[in-house]
Amino acid sequence: MVARLLNESKISKHKGIFVSLNLPNLLAFFRILLAPLMFFMLVNAPEIFTQIHISWINYFAALIFVIASVTDFFDGFIARSWAQKTKLGAILDPLADKMLILAAFLGLMMLGRASAWAVYLILIREFFITGFRVVMASDGVEVAASMAGKVKTVSQMFAVGFLLMNWPGGELLLWIAVALTLYSGFEYIFAYVKAMKKS
């Protein structure tokens, strides 16, 4: 009897793992894998692809970023439409977003295409809010993603796209993304303070 219960527990545990590895979560995993690939191409392109014109490397990196960004839209859409939201997905999706954006900004900064101050501000905000959300969760405060947070992500993606392609206006879009990134970060802090006052 004990052996049978243990066996059923193991099967149910494995089933839970496979249920968590649904299509939206696999897309998030795919996005996580694309982030270091894009960073590697940006930083090492001049040394590795010596026979290919450097502008083609920009296109390759931009293509990787676009593919990753598209999967970001689809994993959320599929999770909502097919009722495939999981706890694993709630962790993987924002993690993949941050890895993709930060890998792109760091690579662009190292190439001299993105202001170091702008990148540092985005980095500090992302890491601070990630840690702050852990504190919020420990205090039982749950804040849903705001419209400012969604607009922030879109603005970051546009800034990265323009900077990758070296198009005019990339630096302006970067600083707009910085402003929205900081604003959405303050929203989390104000929401936490408001929730704690109510409690």
What is the predicted role of each segment?
Residues 2-199:
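Alpha-helical transmembrane bundles and membrane-interface segments of multipass inner-membrane proteins
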